[in-house]
Amino acid sequence: AGMKVEERVIGNAYIYCEKEKAQILKNKVTGPSTQEYLSQFYEELESENRESLQDMEKMQSVDLSYWLPGDILQKADKMSMAHSLEVRVPFLDKEVFDFAAKLPKEAKIAAGTTKYIFRKAVSEFLPQETNERKKLGFPIPIRVWLRQDDWYQMVTDLFTSKEAEEFFHTEKLLQLLNDHKDKKADNSRKIWTVLTFLIWYDRFFTTCSK
């Protein structure tokens, strides 16, 4: 409550706050803040064609313009095609979308219930448990993986590598990893972000330069 719509746009993509980044990154590693990097989204929210929209509609508009085509639809397409599957997204059918776009906010979310009008329409055909189930994505179980011994050792090796020392305070990385393994915190997304960077860096810079 009270959070600016600009901050809400960042949402779950906000993995490290600026203070945390300062703690794990070495001084020579600099870059724009999350707010600076996402300034184009803020500008989109304030642009004339979105000026009359409510906050929720602004967020939906940015999601439709960026998150769907640039992230979630790409992942669904790549992963399904890699397994010879053809995936469809019925809620993005043009007629369904046009109808949903004209609905008032109260028909979309009511008392914390998402897809309210849709759930209401199918309630007599579905079991109550199914109809009232919270929205679920398709998350990869990285939280579990990173607590397994083989994964823990692999990540430890990467977090203490010469490449990691070039960019990060490795003792801070190990603290994140150990706190996660000991179930003191869920640092899975923070660990995963650094891990994927190090694998990418090794593949395209370290390995290629040998």
Question: What are the functions of these language-model segments?
Answer:
Residues 1-210:
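Adenosyl-5′-phosphate
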